[in-house]
Amino acid sequence: WLMVLGARTLDDRGEVLLYRGDTLDVWTLVGPIAGSGRGGLGEFGYMWECPDLFPLGDRHVLISCPQGIAPQGEDYRNLYQCGWLAGHFDGAQFEHGAFHELDRGFEFYAPQTTQDSQGRRLLFGWLGLPEENEMSQPTVAHGWLHQMSCPRELFWQDEWLCQRPVAELEALKGERTRFEGTLGEFPGLAIDSAWLDLDLCGEGSLWFGAVAELVWQQGRITLRRQNWQRGAWETRSSPWAGGRITVLCDRSSLECFIDEGRHSLSA
């Protein structure tokens, strides 16, 4: 058996530790396989949480959540980050490339994956950051807090880790409405939930009620939302190569898959 464990060293460096065990009761430390100051990352957070190491195709992927990374322009905008490293794992060492954010939205953390009976690698993420805002969430009055993401299938596209809603969600679709051509405005739709496939060009925006807006312009997709605690508008954005955008929305959340799943934005 192999186990990966997120860690924080005594000198505040985040690491992912590898353990090996003949049973699930007794484990032996093999050593760190990734972390701050390792694999060409430089200083990269004081703690790494929630690691998940798995094979996908002919490579291995390590998903983890570093804490203590400062924002860099439009990157690393959340309190804690979540991303992936791809490379080769030989059972003891993990040679990998650069760190990439798994979801560039407001709330996405601690994802875990599993392999299903069809051999697909499926991921669920936790939509629930940051914790200092938890008790101000309006759902607290109704006895619940946070939610899981939709189940996502992971796949490679041009050596990039991509995500898409699992095919089984297609069965939940109801009546279809189609808009074609160039539209300055189209009528508002009163819906509780929707699956939107957007083929866009030029510049424009799509409102979700009065509290969230998806904005597209050359090379960039931006998700704006009104913070429920402060009332201020805040943004997260992603590169956009002009490909299809799929949005899953309901009363509580938005999950946007950009360029056929190359990037995602959740809120």
Give residue ranges: language-model regions.
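Structural motif
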Residues: 12-18, 70-86, 132-134, 150
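Flexible loop/turn segments at secondary-structure boundaries
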Residues: 10-12, 38-42, 52-54, 61, ...
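Short consensus segments that form the blades of beta-propeller domains
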Residues: 8-11, 41-44, 73-78, 142-145
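Hydrophobic core segments of beta-strands in well-ordered, beta-rich domains
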Residues: 1-11, 16-19, 29-31, 50-54, ...
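Beta-rich accessory regions
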Residues: 82-267
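Residue-level preference for beta-strand/loop junctions
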Residues: 12-13, 45, 192, 241
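Surface loop/turn signatures of beta-propeller and other carbohydrate-active proteins
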Residues: 5, 26-52, 69, 92-109
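Conserved Ser/Thr-centered positions that define the repeating blades of beta-propeller domains
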Residues: 20-24
